[in-house]
């Protein structure tokens, strides 16, 4: 009888302990359009995986084939004529997946989900992307299954401003639509932007016309992560180093390299569709992040 009681107590304590551990380990899904967009959250993701020991997965909607125009410097590296459109579109999807996974290894990404939708060309027109270019039912069905199975607490997307790539807008819109249609517990979905401490203008975003799920009433981000926080020996290290490492892995995308040392803050915006109940969870997560430093 005594052994049975002890076993029961031990079992209950194990359940409690696991619950406490899981409560402190955030589960995050990133949903982006291209195999380099994750750089917009690089410092935040690194802190979640390395300092809070959380899990971050990544879903990428397109195959990245349209990046051939920026691949000149990568041609001798890969020994492929990547700036030739036909050649670039043939080889870049595989190359960019490998680059992304190398970058993700730095950030601590756990699982990758590639949707392989066409990366046709740069456009601001999200309507054409959603109506013509991508297989939207397939994307939403797979996103739904990934979110349901992953039991995520948060989803990170890029803030879908008017001036951003139509593919970026599309990826965020589909994530918002998928979350809104969930019958089970919904993760909090956030839109991210970057800014510099010397910026003379600030982001103003309240939503995209014809896409009410993108509505944001707040006039400023709910929270930000400072890439310039210093740590290590004589405080000589910052999270910008991690961001630069991550960017450097995307060698086929020459224009990406120009973002090194740019962007001081990763800003996260709260979509109205989350309701107010998720705000406290967001603030708790980022309070932990802003009080944690890698050691």
Please place each PLM-identified region on the residue numbering:
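Sec-dependent N-terminal signal peptides
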Residues: 4-14
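Metal-dependent de-N-acetylase/amidase catalytic core
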Residues: 2-3, 20-31, 128-132, 136-295
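Active-site rim/loop-helix segments in enzyme catalytic domains that contact anionic ligands
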Residues: 20-150, 177
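Sec/Tat signal peptide C-region and signal peptidase I cleavage site
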Residues: 15-19
């Amino acid at each position: 009888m005594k052994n049975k009681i002890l076993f029961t107590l031990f079992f209950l304590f194990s359940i409690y302990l696991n619950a406490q551990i899981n409560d402190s380990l955030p589960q995050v899904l990133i949903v982006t359009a291209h195999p380099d967009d994750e750089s917009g959250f690089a410092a935040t993701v690194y802190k979640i995986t390395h300092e809070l020991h959380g899990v971050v997965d990544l879903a990428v909607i397109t195959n990245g084939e349209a990046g051939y125009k920026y691949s000149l410097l990568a041609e001798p590296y890969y020994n492929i004529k990547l700036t030739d459109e036909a050649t670039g579109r043939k080889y870049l999807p595989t190359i960019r997946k490998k680059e992304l996974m190398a970058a993700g290894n730095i950030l601590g990404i756990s699982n990758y989900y590639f949707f392989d939708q066409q990366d046709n060309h740069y456009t601001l027109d999200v309507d054409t992307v959603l109506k013509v270019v991508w297989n939207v039912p397939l994307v939403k069905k797979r996103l739904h299954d990934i979110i349901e199975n992953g039991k995520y607490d948060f989803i990170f997307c890029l803030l879908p401003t008017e001036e951003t790539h139509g593919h970026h807008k599309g990826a965020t819109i589909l994530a918002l639509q998928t979350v809104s249609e969930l019958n089970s517990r919904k993760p909090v979905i956030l839109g991210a932007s970057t800014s510099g401490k010397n910026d003379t203008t600030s982001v103003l975003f309240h939503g995209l016309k014809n896409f009410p799920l993108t509505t944001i009433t707040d006039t400023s981000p709910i929270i930000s992560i400072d890439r310039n926080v210093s740590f290590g020996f004589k405080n000589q290290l910052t999270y910008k180093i991690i961001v630069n490492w991550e960017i450097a892995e995307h060698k086929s995308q020459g224009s990406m390299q120009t973002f090194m040392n740019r962007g001081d803050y990763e800003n996260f915006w709260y979509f109205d569709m989350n309701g107010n109940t998720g705000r406290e969870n967001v603030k708790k997560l980022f309070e932990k992040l802003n009080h944690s430093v890698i050691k």
